[in-house]
């Protein structure tokens, strides 16, 4: 089932320096909660400055949904320590609140008023809040309080030059973009390995179903927790943050221009369903527009091609201008066993897997094959640890045992690990392979199995509160290592100043400005 990458691995072993200079970055979302686990109703902590313009700490959907962002980094340890400093400073500056350590929220009642993230009075800030108003009206606020970790990854120019020859200008844009689309197609075919190993949301609180019937064969505990005994990541299931209306958009990942055209079409395509919501009611705007996507960021995807945008530029226009610059992996649940929601083992695994995806052949995928890959993902998401589980390739009927496919994949990853270790020194990547491959013979070692044992004992709420309390105490006590207190104070003041400058620079009323941007 795994493509034959022996030739590509042999090539890599002859060109190990092609992997020197991998760049990566992390984003971690987490809900601010009270000591009893309920959602914090306070505004964004003052010490964290402006969520609109802060370089490292912002908010996602809700005012209580923090998002931590590391700069691009070539050093894994440095990146994780930077992320930990962001958590340490925040833990010391959020009063008696804690950071929820799980992807799925718990103590949120059906119909509870969840305050949307606020970004001030600039047109840009008001637009961001209106976008969130649209998300709330389309999918419900509860779905938007699910948290995850995003891992951003780019291969060094040395890799592309070794692979594609001496490339520059438009040629480089085309060939590098084609290379990243290969990564994306392989990710759709084999990325289910990520929720298998690291999925950590096998259960939900009963409030999450909002009284709606479900066809999933949930088991229920006395405390009202619903779980699937072999599930890995309900966050990635249809119960989590997915957009069913997007499933027939036909966006593909074969070619830069084809992909961008599909994306641009989606933000222009009217939706009958969202038209029913209306655009405005009693003088209050309800969504940016009633199209399938309000803006490009609304496209739900487990992985995205990205380029840093310039001021006023849309993500797709940035891609057209310069091609794909990096890949954003979006399938990681919060790691409940780490105070910062992600750990070194996961980052090293993702490095290995992304390199493998760049090496393995990846035939072009039609939108129908893309839909077929979802079958494998759903199996792993809902019953990934089930004995005897099999997976297919695309739309073909042949089935293969998941543990065997996983072990075959790790045989390749071990060779990538040897190459990365040879240029970085030590055996850190090989050690990760040895630790994780054991999960295929013993699913009890996976994150989902480990966290489910705790949840069955103490419920999602009890588990979440215990971890949150322990991590709060730990992070508040730890000294900063990379950033200093004065760095945070300076960024707080600078971010507030940047927001004020944006607000002062606006000349158009929001309604007029919105007509040009909706």
From Swiss-Prot:
An annotated Gene Ontology molecular function: metal ion binding
Keywords per UniProt: ATP-binding, Glutathione biosynthesis, Ligase, Nucleotide-binding
Pathway listed: Sulfur metabolism; glutathione biosynthesis; glutathione from L-cysteine and L-glutamate: step 1/2
Record keyword Ligase present: yes
Enzyme Commission designation: 6.3.2.2
Annotated NCBIfam families: glu_cys_ligase
Family label: Belongs to the glutamate--cysteine ligase type 1 family. Type 1 subfamily.
Protein name in the entry: Glutamate--cysteine ligase
Name of the gene encoding the protein in the UniProt record: gshA
């Amino acid at each position: 089932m795994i493509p034959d990458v022996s030739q590509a691995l042999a090539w890599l072993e002859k060109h190990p320096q092609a992997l020197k200079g991998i760049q990566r970055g992390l984003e971690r979302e987490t809900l601010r909660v009270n000591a009893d686990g309920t959602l914090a109703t306070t505004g964004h902590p003052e010490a964290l400055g402006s969520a609109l313009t802060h370089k490292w700490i912002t908010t996602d959907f809700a005012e209580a949904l923090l998002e931590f962002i590391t700069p691009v980094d070539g050093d894994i340890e440095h990146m994780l320590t930077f992320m930990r400093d962001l958590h340490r400073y925040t833990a010391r500056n959020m009063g008696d609140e804690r950071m929820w350590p799980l992807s799925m929220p718990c103590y949120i009642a059906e119909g509870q008023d969840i305050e949307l993230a606020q970004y001030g009075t600039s047109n840009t800030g008001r637009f961001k809040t209106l976008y969130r108003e649209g998300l709330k009206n389309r999918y419900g606020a509860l779905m938007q309080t699910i948290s995850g970790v995003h891992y951003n990854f780019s291969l060094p120019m040395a890799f592309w030059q070794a692979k594609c020859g001496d490339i520059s200008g438009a040629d480089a844009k085309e060939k590098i973009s084609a290379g990243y689309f290969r990564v994306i197609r392989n990710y759709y075919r084999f990325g289910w390995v990520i929720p298998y190993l690291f999925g950590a949301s096998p259960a939900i609180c009963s409030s999450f179903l909002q009284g709606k019937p479900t066809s999933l064969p949930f088991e229920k505990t006395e405390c009202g927790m619903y779980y699937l005994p072999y599930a890995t990541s309900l966050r990635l299931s249809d119960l989590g943050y997915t957009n069913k209306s997007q499933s027939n958009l036909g966006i593909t990942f074969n070619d830069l221009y084809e992909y961008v055209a599909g994306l641009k079409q989606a933000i222009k395509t009217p939706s009958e369903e969202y038209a029913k919501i209306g655009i405005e009611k009693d003088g209050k705007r309800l969504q940016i527009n009633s199209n399938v996507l309000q803006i490009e960021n609304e496209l739900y995807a487990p992985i995205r091609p990205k380029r840093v945008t310039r001021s006023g530029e849309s993500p797709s226009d940035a891609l057209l201008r310069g091609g794909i610059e990096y890949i954003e992996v979006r399938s990681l649940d919060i790691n409940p066993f780490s105070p910062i929601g992600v750990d070194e083992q996961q980052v090293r695994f993702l490095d290995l897997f992304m390199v493998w995806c760049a090496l393995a052949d990846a035939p072009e995928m039609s939108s129908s094959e893309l839909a077929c890959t979802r079958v494998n993902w759903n199996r792993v998401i809902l019953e990934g640890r089930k004995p005897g589980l099999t997976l297919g390739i695309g739309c073909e009927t042949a089935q293969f045992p998941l543990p065997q496919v996983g072990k075959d994949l790790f045989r390749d990853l071990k060779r990538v690990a040897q190459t990365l270790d040879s240029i970085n020194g030590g055996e850190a990547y090989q050690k990760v392979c040895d630790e994780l491959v054991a999960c295929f013979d013993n699913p009890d070692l996976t994150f989902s199995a480990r966290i489910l044992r705790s949840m069955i004992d103490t419920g999602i709420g009890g588990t979440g509160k215990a971890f949150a309390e322990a991590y709060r105490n730990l992070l508040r006590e730890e000294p900063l290592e990379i950033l200093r207190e004065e760095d945070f104070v300076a960024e707080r003041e600078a971010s507030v100043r940047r927001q004020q400058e944006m607000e002062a620079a606006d000349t158009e009323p929001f309604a007029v400005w919105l007509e040009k941007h909706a």
